[in-house]
């Protein structure tokens, strides 16, 4: 079944339609507002939120949980970073606002572009990930300006997409020392 899904829905990521040799990070307009789209409190958000924020110095950042937020109001020049998955409803929401966005970035910390990289996962979870990845495949290549990845391995594997490596930078909450509680 996984192989049928892969063959039917996945085409190799050859390039991003919006990406050109002239589109470099240095040429992006100044960003005053950043929306980080994520699904709930995830390890990916905890480990990469600070690193993503640091790429937009001076920008007002808003975390948008796409599981609980149905729509957004976008200021002109806002940048959006999509973490891992983007639902069909949110794909439409971004497209509705695309003319006001300075850039759309897709970030992945696992190899979601290659179903064969997921073979070690339990079958039900692997099938879910493959289906979700396939559902956003064409949208990413059409609407994202750039791809960010978490490791040099992913950057090398997808070098033809010119990805940037965003190293993990855990949120201060993860690094805070807390006192253990006592149970009476």
Regions found by a protein language model. Give the residues of each.
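N-terminal pre-catalytic "stem/leader" segment of glycosyltransferase-like enzymes
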Residues: 2-91
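Nucleotide-sugar donor-binding and catalytic loop/hinge architecture
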Residues: 24-30, 173-184
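Intrinsically disordered, low-complexity linkers and terminal regions
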Residues: 37-38, 139-141, 158
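Short aromatic-enriched loop/helix-cap "lid" or pocket-rim segments at secondary-structure transitions
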Residues: 47-48, 115-120, 161, 177-180
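Extended catalytic core of nucleotide-activated donor transferases of GT-like folds
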Residues: 56, 62-143, 149-153
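Conserved beta-strand scaffold positions in the cores of enzyme catalytic domains, especially
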Residues: 61, 104, 163-167
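Short, hinge-like loop/turn segments at secondary-structure boundaries
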Residues: 122-126, 165-167, 182-183
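Donor nucleotide-sugar binding/catalytic pocket of nucleotide-sugar-dependent glycosyltransferases
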Residues: 145-178
């Amino acid at each position: 079944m996984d192989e049928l899904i892969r063959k039917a829905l996945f085409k190799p990521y050859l390039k991003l339609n919006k990406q050109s040799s002239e589109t470099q990070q240095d040429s992006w307009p100044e960003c005053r507002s950043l929306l980080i789209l994520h699904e709930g409190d995830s390890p990916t958000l905890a480990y990469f939120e600070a690193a993503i924020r640091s790429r937009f110095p001076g920008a007002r950042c808003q975390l948008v949980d796409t599981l609980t937020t149905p729509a957004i109001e976008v200021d002109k020049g806002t940048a959006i970073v999509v973490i891992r998955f983007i639902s069909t409803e949110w794909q439409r929401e971004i497209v509705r606002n695309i003319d006001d966005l300075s850039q759309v970035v897709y970030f992945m910390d696992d190899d979601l572009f290659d179903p064969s990289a997921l073979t070690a996962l339990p079958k039900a979870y692997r099938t879910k990930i493959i289906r979700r990845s396939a559902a956003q495949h064409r949208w990413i290549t059409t609407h994202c300006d750039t791809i960010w990845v978490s490791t040099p391995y992913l950057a090398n594997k997808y070098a033809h997409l010119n990805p940037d490596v965003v190293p993990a930078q855990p949120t201060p909450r993860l690094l805070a020392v807390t006192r253990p509680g006592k149970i009476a």
